């Protein structure tokens, strides 16, 4: 599947570069000033009024005008999600399938290196083709004007060779099915193992377990299809996932690493109240009760979801006894987390005076900063390549090479450290 996507991406990007070269058009002259600049100010700063007024309306209706606030919220949520570690879905399954923590770190790092350039080579290729031939595309319209989400299928249908169209669609379907099946399988496992077997039927027979797996899968698929029919556009999906779903569980998954007093009771109530709070805005939006949360406004409520979940986590944790000391001591000795673990560290020090705290916080934060910068550069790399902006491409490559050299010393050679 991934090889198909690589082939498709290379073909699409190459076709875009060929059309751009043959047209003789300097694409930045056709776009608002600053379009090719990855930096931005308080607002997005792209004036589409004289080029495509419908684009201005779309950006305003989707809430992307105050771009700095959106990026700040996304960065804040991204930091929390990174602190939370692998999400409790198929991401966690991938991590657990590796042989060691060192291999898990390498696998996680290589995903960005392999995935980002290939993905955005295709994305930028489709973008360039859409810009070059925008006036020739048979785009659909709705009440608010042009349906911009019809640009990509129109470009694929009209400007890619027939055989390549089939390959691209096969790649898209393959990517969808792998993501869908991975998420579905993880959901079924949680429902069957953590709910059905633990609380309802601990002595269930094999056939009962299989049937419950089938039933839970069918219910999730039906709910997913129903939600899909209510979704208005891609922007709504983005906001539901970023602000809603992640906002519902991120705080509980952060605390489990950094606070010794956190327990299963706190995790349960944190997840419960977090998901309920974060599900209300999407539910009101998709059901048409109100359009207040349309656009990116839902993203601004992310801190509120975090506060609600944090309070629920703390109260829930103190409402039940702490996790037994043997488990906490074993976890601390194996993982050596930084954070609020002083009582556990002091207790271990009574019998093991040589035990040291994790002193790699500053190095870890440096690696996080370098990693984020490196991922941004990997995203820019194929974009500048397709646009034939060789100076910008050279700067990106040079910066990425410097980051690789630094992280080779601060990350790669220290993967076995705590």
Predicted regions span which residues?
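Membrane-embedded helix-loop-helix hairpins and adjacent transmembrane boundary segments
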Residues: 1-418
């Amino acid at each position: 599947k991934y090889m198909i996507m690589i082939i498709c991406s290379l073909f699409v990007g190459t076709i875009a570069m060929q059309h751009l070269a043959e047209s003789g058009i300097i694409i930045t002259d056709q776009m608002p000033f600053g379009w090719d600049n990855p930096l931005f100010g308080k607002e997005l700063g792209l004036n589409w009024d004289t080029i495509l007024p419908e684009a201005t309306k779309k950006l305003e209706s989707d809430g992307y005008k105050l771009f700095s606030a959106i990026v700040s919220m996304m960065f804040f949520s991204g930091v929390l999600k990174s602190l939370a570690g692998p999400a409790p879905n198929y991401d966690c399954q991938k991590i657990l399938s590796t042989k060691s923590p060192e291999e898990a770190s390498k696998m996680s790092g290589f995903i960005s290196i392999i995935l980002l350039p290939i993905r955005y080579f295709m994305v930028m290729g489709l973008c360039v083709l859409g810009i070059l031939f925008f006036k020739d595309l048979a785009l659909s319209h709705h009440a608010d004007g042009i349906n911009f989400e019809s640009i990509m299928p129109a470009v694929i249908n009209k400007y890619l060779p027939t055989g390549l169209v089939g390959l691209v669609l096969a790649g898209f379907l393959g990517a969808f099915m792998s993501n869908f099946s991975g998420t579905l399988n993880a959901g079924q496992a949680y429902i069957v193992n953590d709910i059905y077997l633990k609380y309802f039927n601990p002595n269930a027979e094999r056939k009962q377990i299989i049937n419950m797996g089938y039933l839970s899968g069918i219910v999730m698929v039906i709910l997913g299809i129903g939600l899909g029919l209510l979704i208005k556009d891609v922007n709504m999906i983005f906001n539901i996932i970023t602000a809603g779903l992640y906002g519902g569980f991120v705080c509980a998954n952060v605390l489990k690493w950094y606070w010794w007093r956190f327990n299963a009771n706190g995790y349960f109530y944190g997840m419960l109240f977090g998901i309920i709070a974060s599900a209300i805005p999407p539910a009101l939006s998709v059901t048409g009760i109100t359009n207040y949360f349309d656009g990116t406004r839902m993203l601004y409520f992310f801190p509120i979801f975090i506060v609600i979940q944090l309070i629920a986590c703390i109260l829930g944790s103190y409402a039940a006894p702490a996790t037994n000391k043997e488990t906490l001591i074993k976890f601390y000795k194996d993982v050596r987390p930084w954070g609020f673990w002083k009582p556990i560290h002091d207790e271990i020090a009574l019998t093991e005076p040589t035990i040291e705290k994790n002193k790699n916080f500053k190095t870890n934060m440096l690696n996080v900063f370098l990693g984020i910068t490196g991922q941004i550069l990997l995203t820019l790399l194929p974009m500048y390549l397709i646009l034939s902006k060789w100076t910008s491409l050279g700067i990106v490559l040079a910066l990425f090479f410097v980051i690789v050299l630094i992280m080779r010393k601060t990350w790669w050679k220290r993967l076995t450290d705590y």
